[in-house]
Amino acid sequence: MKSDFSDVRGFNYQLSTGSTSLENWLYYDPTIYELELRRGKEYFPGWNTIRLWLSWDAYFRRPAVFKERFESMVSIADRLGLKTIACLFNRWHDVSGFDNGGVYLDNFLFPQAWAYYVPLYESYVSDVVGAHGGDERIVLWDICNEPWPYNEFTEPIMGVWQAEFDWLTRMHKALKAAAPDTPVCVSVHNYLGLDGLRWVDPISDAFSIHPYYMCTSDNLYDPKRRAKYDQHIREYVEYARSVGKPLLATETCWGAETDEERAEIIRFTLETLTKYNLGFIPHALHYGATADLHTDDDSFMGETYLPFINKDGSLRAGHEVYNNY
């Protein structure tokens, strides 16, 4: 794999069975895991990277079992020709209320809080990452998925911002002590823009962005909206180049309920990203019980509908457009 990650052709993946990352780790089934990854390789032969969402709370329930399951996941992926990007923490919390779990303010904001877990998080990072120091199957450690999950940054929020950055910095230090040679990133969400890259620059070897072309049926083809998205990507690329760090899209390809509209979102998004020579990891490979990956048949839908593969294992119509890029 190229050091700039430009050849990454990936997918985010969560097991289809659990409604949170915790459930997927507690009730991990390697047979289902391999089946769903094999489906992905069948439909997308050029797929070469999987982004796995780890679960710190599953680790603390049974550390040895968690590490065995992580090794199983990485090993199965490797047999199928997939490198792994391992995401250690999650700060994305779905606006619909269908929460995936992860890290909350009490976990890092005040040492006096009962649920202040920063020292525990350090031991989790040291143990899990340390067990894979120098592991060439893991190409990138993603410290956290979408930190600073806020729509705007008012004065009260900026007080939280510093505590969150301090926590991320401690996780970076623990990670680098455990695996100094594996690149590290922090996956920032759309709303942060270039500020997000500036904020995580001190704790990143590579930049990890989530450039979703967020649209509806009414504005999917809006030329001004598309031009703004292109400009958005160009600014990311120029900033990353200015500081000499690689740039990778670890989530992308906004969802839609209709297959036709989703396929067009995929086409436009990947056409834009590859225009700037960026590797990409759409969200997400397979239908599942977690937020944004299922229809109303399996609970209420979240903000959008993002899987590439249907519940019955078939490919959503038109989603083979991925293979063009």
Predicted features and spans:
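His/Asp/Glu-enriched short active-site or ligand-binding loop at hydrolase and phosphoryl-transfer sites
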Residues: 210, 216-217, 281-284
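Residue-level signal for short, function-critical loop segments
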Residues: 56, 190, 210-213, 253
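Active-site mouth of glycoside hydrolases
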Residues: 1-204, 242-243, 273-290, 294-305, ...
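Short, charged, surface-exposed secondary-structure boundary motifs
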Residues: 21, 216-220
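Short glycine-rich, flexible loops that bind phosphorylated cofactors or substrates
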Residues: 59, 215-216
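Substrate-binding and catalytic surfaces of secreted/luminal carbohydrate-active proteins
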Residues: 223-276
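Short, glycine/acidic-enriched loop or turn micro-motifs at the edges of active sites
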Residues: 145, 149, 213, 254
